[in-house]
Amino acid sequence: MILTIDIGNSNIDLAYFNGNKIVSHYEFETKKFSTSYEYALIIEWTLKREKLQEKDILGVALSSVVPSLTSAFIDAIKYLFGKPPFVVEPGIKTGISIETENPKEVGADLICNVVAITEEYGHCGIAVDFGTATTFSVVEKKKFLGAAIAPGVGTSAFALFEKTAKLPQVDIKAPESSLGKNTISAIQAGIVYGFAGLVDGILERQIKELKYKPVLVSTGGWAKRIVPYTKYLKEKDIDPYLTLKGLYYLYLKNL
């Protein structure tokens, strides 16, 4: 059994792999001031839920975009399993050529996503990750060509609430019409249909710059709320575990 842990800005995803299949998945809120002891307790709790012991885990893979938590998790994993995890960081084997100005600054989540695309979906693809940020990662012929990064759906909605005096926080869902008849439906229309337009606009530009027709795969917590209203993305191509799959494949490449 392989344990994979993906630390994001909003959530921490944890999955157990048996072979190349996810047998269980857990999601926790990211708390940036928690200690390694607290995270060790969380991991230990998932082990008990799965009726597993530490000796059943052959390896642990860690991806993080929150530097302050990376060391806490490394210490927690060392404490539980007696050895450090594999960490997605510059210098690891990816099987992908990073064609950017500074490969070392490419986020671990973007690397995981393009590796998963290459391993599971084909030689050319775009991963759209609807997280705290909305990212568009492009891979073609095992080359990471670049990315686009936009604010996340929830991030934008919260900023609208925080920076305005009279606009309320709303449940982010698509209203019946883009013509909002009240403040709540107007905000919902702006966020949902606005992000759908943002996604289509970026994808249209990226697709034109590629030599081959890309596979389009979406992931992230906001995907199900936005994808149905886009032109390019399909609900059937939402892969909620894309980043974790990429992390698993990276672990195997670095054994």
Curated annotation (Swiss-Prot):
Gene3D superfamilies per record: 3.30.420.40
Entries under SUPFAM superfamilies matching the protein: Actin-like ATPase domain (SSF53067)
Top-rank taxon: Bacteria
Keywords: ATP-binding, Coenzyme A biosynthesis, Cytoplasm, Kinase, Metal-binding, Nucleotide-binding, Potassium, Transferase
Cellular compartments annotated: Cytoplasm
A GO BP entry: coenzyme A biosynthetic process
Cofactor: how bound: A monovalent cation. Ammonium or potassium.
Broad class of where this protein is predominantly found: cytoplasm
Binding sites annotated in the UniProt record for K(+): D129
Entry GO MF terms: ATP binding; metal ion binding; pantothenate kinase activity
Residues annotated to bind ATP: D6, I7, G8, N9, S10, N11, I12, D13, T132
Cofactor(s) listed: NH4(+); K(+)
Protein EC: 2.7.1.33
A GO CC annotation given for this chain: cytoplasm
Catalytic residues (positions): D109
Signal peptide: none
Pathway, per record: Cofactor biosynthesis; coenzyme A biosynthesis; CoA from (R)-pantothenate: step 1/5
Binding-site positions, substrate: G107, A108, D109, L110, T183
Reactions catalysed: (R)-pantothenate + ATP = (R)-4'-phosphopantothenate + ADP + H(+)
Enzyme class: transferase
HAMAP family: Pantothen_kinase_3
Family: Belongs to the type III pantothenate kinase family.
Cited PANTHER family: TYPE III PANTOTHENATE KINASE
Subunit structure: Homodimer.
Protein function: Catalyzes the phosphorylation of pantothenate (Pan), the first step in CoA biosynthesis.
Name the record gives this protein: Type III pantothenate kinase
Naturally occurring in which organism (per UniProt): Dictyoglomus turgidum (strain DSM 6724 / Z-1310)
Lineage per the UniProt record: Bacteria, Pseudomonadati, Dictyoglomota, Dictyoglomia, Dictyoglomales
